[in-house]
Each structure stands twice: as C-alpha cells, then as structure tokens.
Amino acid sequence: MSFAEKITGLLARPNQQDPIGPEQPWYLKYGSRLLGIVAAFFAILFGLWNVFSIITLSVSCLVAGIIQMVAGFVVMLLEAPCCFVCFEQVNVIADKVDSKPLYFRAGLYITMAIPPIILCFGLASLFGSGLIFGTGVVYGMMALGKKASAEDMRAAAQQTFGGNTPAQTNDRAGIVNNAQPFSFTGAVGTDSNV
C-alpha cells in the first residue's frame, strides 16, 4: 500500500460515494478535506482566544470569537464527522451537504469566514477565519472544474455564433467594416473649419 493510498484511506469516510467526481485529482479532493480539518481546528482555537478578549471589554471580539468557533465546528462537522460520534444525526447532515454541488460548500465556507474578520480584525481572527476562507476558495476552484484542452479552446474560439464571420487576422482588417482610410490632403467636406 502506497503512502497516497494510506492518506486517502485515512481521510475517506466509511461508505463514501465520491461526491466530487473522478475528474478531480486525489490530492485536490483529500487535500481540501485536510485543509478544512486543519482550518476548523485553528478556527476553534483562535476563536477561543478571541472570546478571552472579553477581559479587555471588547464585545465585538467576543462576538467574533463565538462566530469563529461556531464556523470551526460547522467546518469540522462537514469535513470530519467522525469527530462528532456522540451526535446521531451528524452523518446525515454531512451526507446531505456532500450531495450538494461544490459551489454550495464553497459559498458556505466563505460566508462563514467573513464576519469574524470584519468584527475583530486581528491575527487570531485573520488566521483562523482565513484558513476557512481558503478552504472555501479551494472548493470554489474545484467547482469550476479543470481547464479545457488547448484543442477544445481553439475550436471554441474559431466557432461562428449567429452568422458572425470569424475574426480576420490580416493587417488590413479593421474594427469597422467599409471604413475609409484617412486622407491628409485636406479637410473633410462636412468639417466646419472650427
């Protein structure tokens, strides 16, 4: 068993279907899950640090810390439901979110990461919520899919749409059809010489 197979076996859930699809490389599928787990851990840790800022009477940092801890728990619930074995419905919730498109998860993570940074801008909220934001960005990139091959992009660029002529590539091709060349011999007939 190779190292990659061991890592994928550790990160895969029992009876997991492969919701992301075969077009994604294994390191992107499991790397995003690992990044989400690490992000959730640090979000909870630094959210607790922000909650302790109540000592300095900073209520906005207290609220930001609570939101950041909740976001960390939600990300941990969705990425590693094995951490919440004491709750019965965790696998149902995680499977329901796994069945949704990847852009749903990306939007959820990005949306959850922004309020703590706005409420209490500091290293703790920036790092904890920033990792969750980064996880959302990775899922968003996975939702976009991989880039088409060069042949497909060339074919799409050369297609005509709605009777339009393909782009001309010679030096005499102008932006406006039937444009007359500039004449420097005199003023244009409609010019008022003003």
UniProtKB/Swiss-Prot annotation:
Channel activity is inhibited by La(3+), which reduces Ca(2+) influx and thus inhibits it's function in promoting activity-dependent bulk endocytosis (ADBE) in response to high stimuli. Keywords: Calcium, Calcium channel, Calcium transport, Cell membrane, Cell projection, Cytoplasmic vesicle, Endocytosis, Endosome, Ion channel, Ion transport, Membrane, Synapse, Transmembrane, Transmembrane helix, Transport. It is a multi-pass membrane protein. GO terms for biological process: bulk synaptic vesicle endocytosis; cell competition in a multicellular organism; clathrin-dependent synaptic vesicle endocytosis; photoreceptor cell differentiation; positive regulation of neuron apoptotic process; positive regulation of presynaptic cytosolic calcium concentration; synaptic vesicle endocytosis. It comes from the Eukaryota. The chain crosses the membrane at residues 35-55, 66-88, 113-133. The record marks E79 as: Calcium ion selectivity. This is Calcium channel flower.
